[in-house]
Amino acid sequence: MAALTLAGCQSAPKPLPVVAAPPPPVEPPPLPPKPIPKAPRIGLALGGGAARGFAHIGVIQVLEENGIKPDLVAGTSAGSLVAALYASGKSGAELAALADSMDESAFTDWSFPGRGLIRGEGLAKYVRDHTGGLRIEQMRVPLGIVATDLDNGEAILFQRGDPGVAVRASSAVPAVFQPVRIGLREYVDGGLVAPVPVRFARQMGAELVIAVDISAVPDGNPTGDAMRMLLQTFSIMGRSINTFELRDADVLLRPKLPNVSGADFTARKRSIQAGREAMQSQLAALRERIAAKTH
Protein backbone atom coordinates (compact mmCIF):
# COMPACT_ATOMS: atom_id res chain seq x y z
CA MET A 1 0.00 0.00 0.00
CA ALA A 2 2.78 2.35 0.87
CA ALA A 3 4.48 1.47 -2.41
CA LEU A 4 1.38 2.33 -4.39
CA THR A 5 1.04 5.64 -2.63
CA LEU A 6 4.66 6.46 -3.30
CA ALA A 7 4.33 5.55 -6.96
CA GLY A 8 1.26 7.80 -7.27
CA CYS A 9 3.13 10.73 -5.81
CA GLN A 10 6.00 10.22 -8.19
CA SER A 11 3.73 10.18 -11.25
CA ALA A 12 1.70 13.36 -10.36
CA PRO A 13 2.26 16.18 -12.93
CA LYS A 14 4.45 19.05 -11.88
CA PRO A 15 2.61 22.41 -11.53
CA LEU A 16 3.26 24.86 -14.33
CA PRO A 17 5.27 27.93 -13.43
CA VAL A 18 3.24 31.11 -12.95
CA VAL A 19 4.23 33.76 -15.45
CA ALA A 20 2.98 37.32 -14.88
CA ALA A 21 1.32 39.04 -17.82
CA PRO A 22 3.36 41.91 -19.24
CA PRO A 23 2.14 45.33 -18.11
CA PRO A 24 0.22 47.34 -20.66
CA PRO A 25 2.34 49.81 -22.59
CA VAL A 26 2.58 53.17 -20.88
CA GLU A 27 1.10 55.92 -22.97
CA PRO A 28 3.29 59.01 -23.09
CA PRO A 29 1.66 62.02 -21.42
CA PRO A 30 -0.13 64.27 -23.88
CA LEU A 31 1.78 67.28 -25.04
CA PRO A 32 0.60 70.50 -23.42
CA PRO A 33 -1.50 72.61 -25.76
CA LYS A 34 0.35 75.34 -27.54
CA PRO A 35 -0.28 78.64 -25.81
CA ILE A 36 -2.59 80.95 -27.69
CA PRO A 37 -0.56 83.89 -28.98
CA LYS A 38 -1.29 86.93 -26.86
CA ALA A 39 -1.38 90.27 -28.63
CA PRO A 40 -0.01 93.32 -26.82
CA ARG A 41 -2.37 95.70 -25.06
CA ILE A 42 -2.77 98.60 -27.45
CA GLY A 43 -3.08 102.12 -26.09
CA LEU A 44 -4.21 105.12 -28.12
CA ALA A 45 -2.73 108.45 -26.98
CA LEU A 46 -4.64 111.41 -28.42
CA GLY A 47 -2.94 114.79 -28.21
CA GLY A 48 -4.20 118.33 -27.88
CA GLY A 49 -4.63 120.85 -30.66
CA ALA A 50 -8.08 122.42 -30.29
CA ALA A 51 -10.06 122.27 -33.57
CA ARG A 52 -7.32 120.17 -35.19
CA GLY A 53 -8.57 117.37 -32.92
CA PHE A 54 -11.09 116.25 -35.54
CA ALA A 55 -8.14 114.38 -37.08
CA HIS A 56 -8.35 111.87 -34.22
CA ILE A 57 -11.66 110.67 -35.63
CA GLY A 58 -10.04 109.68 -38.92
CA VAL A 59 -7.40 107.67 -37.07
CA ILE A 60 -10.09 105.77 -35.17
CA GLN A 61 -12.04 105.08 -38.37
CA VAL A 62 -9.06 103.45 -40.09
CA LEU A 63 -8.24 101.35 -37.02
CA GLU A 64 -11.82 100.08 -36.95
CA GLU A 65 -11.86 99.33 -40.67
CA ASN A 66 -8.76 97.17 -40.22
CA GLY A 67 -9.99 95.28 -37.17
CA ILE A 68 -7.55 96.92 -34.76
CA LYS A 69 -9.22 97.80 -31.46
CA PRO A 70 -7.33 99.79 -28.84
CA ASP A 71 -7.54 98.27 -25.37
CA LEU A 72 -7.38 101.69 -23.71
CA VAL A 73 -7.33 105.35 -24.65
CA ALA A 74 -5.73 108.41 -23.05
CA GLY A 75 -6.39 111.98 -24.11
CA THR A 76 -5.18 115.51 -23.52
CA SER A 77 -7.23 118.65 -24.24
CA ALA A 78 -9.01 118.17 -27.60
CA GLY A 79 -7.80 114.58 -27.51
CA SER A 80 -9.60 114.06 -24.20
CA LEU A 81 -12.93 115.00 -25.80
CA VAL A 82 -12.53 112.48 -28.63
CA ALA A 83 -11.15 109.90 -26.18
CA ALA A 84 -14.17 110.23 -23.88
CA LEU A 85 -16.67 109.93 -26.73
CA TYR A 86 -14.84 106.92 -28.19
CA ALA A 87 -14.46 105.21 -24.81
CA SER A 88 -18.20 105.51 -24.22
CA GLY A 89 -18.79 103.24 -27.20
CA LYS A 90 -19.06 105.64 -30.14
CA SER A 91 -17.86 104.23 -33.47
CA GLY A 92 -15.76 106.16 -35.94
CA ALA A 93 -18.85 106.81 -38.05
CA GLU A 94 -20.77 108.09 -35.04
CA LEU A 95 -17.88 110.36 -34.08
CA ALA A 96 -17.82 111.81 -37.60
CA ALA A 97 -21.57 112.45 -37.43
CA LEU A 98 -21.12 114.24 -34.10
CA ALA A 99 -18.32 116.33 -35.57
CA ASP A 100 -20.48 117.31 -38.52
CA SER A 101 -23.35 118.45 -36.30
CA MET A 102 -21.24 120.02 -33.56
CA ASP A 103 -22.08 123.64 -32.78
CA GLU A 104 -18.98 125.16 -31.23
CA SER A 105 -21.03 128.05 -29.86
CA ALA A 106 -22.45 125.57 -27.34
CA PHE A 107 -19.00 125.50 -25.75
CA THR A 108 -18.56 129.25 -25.52
CA ASP A 109 -20.30 130.09 -22.26
CA TRP A 110 -18.69 133.48 -21.81
CA SER A 111 -17.52 134.68 -18.43
CA PHE A 112 -17.00 138.41 -17.72
CA PRO A 113 -15.12 139.26 -15.64
CA GLY A 114 -13.25 136.12 -14.69
CA ARG A 115 -10.01 134.18 -14.83
CA GLY A 116 -10.81 133.04 -18.34
CA LEU A 117 -13.05 134.11 -21.19
CA ILE A 118 -15.05 130.86 -21.15
CA ARG A 119 -16.43 129.01 -18.14
CA GLY A 120 -16.29 125.61 -19.81
CA GLU A 121 -19.50 124.21 -18.35
CA GLY A 122 -20.95 124.03 -21.87
CA LEU A 123 -18.15 121.65 -22.84
CA ALA A 124 -18.71 119.55 -19.73
CA LYS A 125 -22.43 119.29 -20.49
CA TYR A 126 -21.71 118.28 -24.10
CA VAL A 127 -19.52 115.43 -22.87
CA ARG A 128 -22.10 114.24 -20.35
CA ASP A 129 -24.89 114.39 -22.93
CA HIS A 130 -22.94 112.28 -25.44
CA THR A 131 -21.41 109.66 -23.14
CA GLY A 132 -24.70 108.23 -21.91
CA GLY A 133 -24.26 109.30 -18.30
CA LEU A 134 -21.32 106.94 -17.85
CA ARG A 135 -18.61 107.77 -15.35
CA ILE A 136 -14.99 107.42 -16.41
CA GLU A 137 -14.60 104.09 -14.63
CA GLN A 138 -17.72 102.74 -16.39
CA MET A 139 -16.57 103.42 -19.94
CA ARG A 140 -16.58 100.55 -22.44
CA VAL A 141 -12.92 101.21 -23.19
CA PRO A 142 -10.62 102.11 -20.27
CA LEU A 143 -10.20 105.89 -20.33
CA GLY A 144 -7.59 108.26 -18.93
CA ILE A 145 -7.81 112.06 -19.13
CA VAL A 146 -4.77 114.24 -18.43
CA ALA A 147 -4.90 117.70 -16.86
CA THR A 148 -2.39 119.95 -15.09
CA ASP A 149 -2.60 120.75 -11.38
CA LEU A 150 -2.41 124.55 -11.33
CA ASP A 151 -1.13 124.63 -7.76
CA ASN A 152 2.00 122.50 -8.25
CA GLY A 153 2.36 122.16 -12.03
CA GLU A 154 2.13 118.37 -11.95
CA ALA A 155 0.13 116.15 -14.27
CA ILE A 156 -2.98 114.39 -13.06
CA LEU A 157 -4.56 111.37 -14.74
CA PHE A 158 -8.31 111.15 -14.22
CA GLN A 159 -9.52 107.54 -14.31
CA ARG A 160 -12.62 107.95 -12.18
CA GLY A 161 -15.42 110.46 -11.88
CA ASP A 162 -17.41 112.77 -14.14
CA PRO A 163 -15.99 112.72 -17.69
CA GLY A 164 -17.46 116.14 -18.39
CA VAL A 165 -15.52 117.75 -15.55
CA ALA A 166 -12.33 115.87 -16.50
CA VAL A 167 -12.52 116.91 -20.17
CA ARG A 168 -13.29 120.47 -19.13
CA ALA A 169 -10.19 120.50 -16.91
CA SER A 170 -8.00 118.88 -19.57
CA SER A 171 -9.13 121.48 -22.12
CA ALA A 172 -8.88 124.57 -19.91
CA VAL A 173 -6.35 126.60 -21.89
CA PRO A 174 -5.14 129.30 -19.47
CA ALA A 175 -6.71 132.72 -20.09
CA VAL A 176 -9.23 131.17 -22.52
CA PHE A 177 -11.03 128.81 -20.14
CA GLN A 178 -11.43 129.29 -16.42
CA PRO A 179 -9.43 126.87 -14.25
CA VAL A 180 -11.55 123.95 -13.04
CA ARG A 181 -11.84 123.37 -9.32
CA ILE A 182 -12.14 119.75 -8.22
CA GLY A 183 -12.12 119.34 -4.47
CA LEU A 184 -9.43 121.63 -3.09
CA ARG A 185 -7.36 121.73 -6.29
CA GLU A 186 -7.55 123.71 -9.51
CA TYR A 187 -6.75 122.22 -12.90
CA VAL A 188 -5.92 123.57 -16.36
CA ASP A 189 -5.06 122.21 -19.81
CA GLY A 190 -3.14 118.92 -19.80
CA GLY A 191 -1.09 120.11 -22.77
CA LEU A 192 1.14 122.04 -20.37
CA VAL A 193 2.62 118.78 -19.11
CA ALA A 194 1.65 116.05 -21.61
CA PRO A 195 0.63 117.36 -25.05
CA VAL A 196 0.40 113.74 -26.24
CA PRO A 197 -0.12 111.45 -23.21
CA VAL A 198 2.14 108.55 -24.20
CA ARG A 199 3.53 107.91 -20.72
CA PHE A 200 0.05 107.91 -19.25
CA ALA A 201 -1.10 105.30 -21.77
CA ARG A 202 1.87 103.22 -20.56
CA GLN A 203 0.86 103.88 -16.97
CA MET A 204 -2.60 102.53 -17.75
CA GLY A 205 -1.07 99.27 -18.97
CA ALA A 206 -0.45 99.75 -22.68
CA GLU A 207 2.30 97.56 -24.14
CA LEU A 208 2.08 99.22 -27.55
CA VAL A 209 1.20 102.90 -27.91
CA ILE A 210 -0.16 104.67 -30.99
CA ALA A 211 0.46 108.38 -30.47
CA VAL A 212 -1.38 111.05 -32.46
CA ASP A 213 0.33 114.44 -32.46
CA ILE A 214 -1.90 117.18 -33.89
CA SER A 215 0.13 120.15 -32.68
CA ALA A 216 0.66 122.95 -35.19
CA VAL A 217 4.10 123.74 -36.56
CA PRO A 218 4.71 127.51 -36.76
CA ASP A 219 4.73 128.43 -40.45
CA GLY A 220 6.07 131.96 -40.24
CA ASN A 221 2.75 133.55 -41.14
CA PRO A 222 1.10 136.20 -38.93
CA THR A 223 -0.98 134.63 -36.18
CA GLY A 224 -3.85 137.06 -36.69
CA ASP A 225 -6.19 137.49 -33.74
CA ALA A 226 -5.39 137.04 -30.06
CA MET A 227 -6.93 133.56 -29.90
CA ARG A 228 -4.73 132.21 -32.70
CA MET A 229 -1.68 133.83 -31.12
CA LEU A 230 -2.43 132.22 -27.77
CA LEU A 231 -3.02 128.78 -29.28
CA GLN A 232 0.20 129.00 -31.29
CA THR A 233 2.14 130.03 -28.17
CA PHE A 234 0.67 127.04 -26.39
CA SER A 235 1.63 124.77 -29.28
CA ILE A 236 5.23 126.03 -29.29
CA MET A 237 5.52 125.29 -25.58
CA GLY A 238 4.14 121.81 -26.09
CA ARG A 239 6.50 120.87 -28.90
CA SER A 240 9.56 120.89 -26.65
CA ILE A 241 7.78 118.66 -24.14
CA ASN A 242 6.66 116.36 -26.96
CA THR A 243 10.27 115.76 -27.97
CA PHE A 244 10.68 113.58 -24.89
CA GLU A 245 7.13 112.28 -24.57
CA LEU A 246 6.91 110.91 -28.12
CA ARG A 247 10.15 108.93 -27.92
CA ASP A 248 8.26 106.22 -26.06
CA ALA A 249 5.57 105.81 -28.73
CA ASP A 250 5.61 102.64 -30.84
CA VAL A 251 3.78 104.26 -33.74
CA LEU A 252 3.69 108.04 -34.15
CA LEU A 253 1.13 109.77 -36.34
CA ARG A 254 1.33 113.42 -37.38
CA PRO A 255 -1.70 114.23 -39.55
CA LYS A 256 -0.87 116.79 -42.22
CA LEU A 257 -2.99 119.84 -41.47
CA PRO A 258 -1.49 122.77 -43.36
CA ASN A 259 -3.37 126.03 -42.93
CA VAL A 260 -5.63 124.54 -40.25
CA SER A 261 -5.32 126.44 -37.00
CA GLY A 262 -6.54 125.32 -33.62
CA ALA A 263 -9.33 127.88 -33.91
CA ASP A 264 -10.54 126.68 -37.33
CA PHE A 265 -13.76 124.72 -36.88
CA THR A 266 -14.59 124.92 -40.59
CA ALA A 267 -12.04 122.28 -41.64
CA ARG A 268 -13.65 119.32 -39.87
CA LYS A 269 -13.91 116.98 -42.86
CA ARG A 270 -10.43 117.90 -44.07
CA SER A 271 -9.05 117.21 -40.59
CA ILE A 272 -10.78 113.83 -40.39
CA GLN A 273 -9.37 112.92 -43.80
CA ALA A 274 -5.89 113.96 -42.68
CA GLY A 275 -6.22 111.62 -39.71
CA ARG A 276 -7.29 108.79 -42.00
CA GLU A 277 -4.32 109.32 -44.29
CA ALA A 278 -1.88 109.47 -41.38
CA MET A 279 -3.13 106.16 -40.00
CA GLN A 280 -3.23 104.47 -43.40
CA SER A 281 0.38 105.44 -44.03
CA GLN A 282 1.45 103.70 -40.81
CA LEU A 283 -0.75 100.59 -40.97
CA ALA A 284 2.07 98.31 -42.14
CA ALA A 285 4.37 99.59 -39.41
CA LEU A 286 1.64 99.11 -36.82
CA ARG A 287 0.99 95.52 -37.89
CA GLU A 288 4.73 94.81 -37.68
CA ARG A 289 4.90 96.20 -34.16
CA ILE A 290 1.87 94.19 -33.09
CA ALA A 291 3.41 91.00 -34.53
CA ALA A 292 6.75 91.71 -32.85
CA LYS A 293 5.08 92.15 -29.45
CA THR A 294 2.71 89.18 -29.75
CA HIS A 295 3.91 86.34 -27.51
Could you tell me what each predicted segment is?
Residues 2-4, 8-73, 85-295:
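Patatin-like phospholipase
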